[in-house]
Swiss-Prot record:
Major localization listed first in the record, in broad terms: membrane
GO molecular function: undecaprenyl-diphosphatase activity
Organism: Prochlorococcus marinus (strain MIT 9312)
Topology class, membrane: Multi-pass membrane protein
Keywords: Antibiotic resistance, Cell inner membrane, Cell membrane, Cell shape, Cell wall biogenesis/degradation, Hydrolase, Membrane, Peptidoglycan synthesis, Transmembrane, Transmembrane helix
Compartments it resides in: Cell inner membrane
Segments crossing the lipid bilayer: 41-61, 89-109, 114-134, 155-175, 191-211, 218-238, 248-268
Gene Ontology biological process terms from the UniProt entry: cell wall organization; peptidoglycan biosynthetic process; regulation of cell shape; response to antibiotic
The keyword NAD is assigned to this record: no
Function as written in the Swiss-Prot or TrEMBL entry: Catalyzes the dephosphorylation of undecaprenyl diphosphate (UPP). Confers resistance to bacitracin.
Entry's Gene Ontology cellular component terms: plasma membrane
Protein name in the entry: Undecaprenyl-diphosphatase
Amino acid sequence: MFSEYLKFFLYGLIQGLTEFFPVSSTAHLKVISVFFGIDDPGPSLSAIIQLGSVLALVCYFRNDFFKLKIQSSKKIFDYLIHERLLRSIFIGTIPIILLGGTIKLFVPYFFDEIFRSNLSIALVSFLMAILMYIADRSKKGSINLKNHKYSDSFLIGLSQALAIFPGVSRSGVTISTALLSGWGRSDSAKFSFLLGMPAISFAAIVEFISSFNAFSSFSFFPLIVGLTTTFLSSLLAIHFLLKYFSSNGLKLFIIYRIVFGFVILLNL
């Protein structure tokens, strides 16, 4: 029997690591809950725990949004916002807000049966492995955070909208789309992470509003343990992937997604 603290620690650890590794956090939270015999956290709890990942993104990439400048004449701090990057993130976030918001408003239980099933998650894992393989084998381009077009941001944002389907992996599909569009490895991962900040926040806010009563059933201190674990494991995942991916590509994660898919199928 898992204690509440251990259960939320496990939720946070899995969420933090798999949110940024291209392997799907939603799929792992669901499958791990079955493996350990604990409750599926469901979309509401998953969304609120994801806020730990958002905080990790803010901390890790704070210098990509703000440049600190000390004005000697006025002796005040003036934060210069990287406007182009913020515009790109805004443009790339539009598709997932439109699609996710539409589904939540008009068909709120769209994913509960078919798309959250283990069979569906396994099949999506195989499809993502194929996409990631094609992207990893594509010719490496020179598009980066400084010279990209807003149309690049929108295209990657369109792919991010697919991440509302359980098992897709937001980072996996956006990194793959960036690589196929001619982005370099390092900046494709970096932009994917930055683009995830408003998307993850939006999901958490929508779930909080639509399932407000459900949050009263969560114990406060175990939830804090989950959020803290998510934050710390997210920082580790971001740092590791940026270092590893720039030199090694997606090979390790492609193999993992195939194995993960077969493990799910064998346990149906």
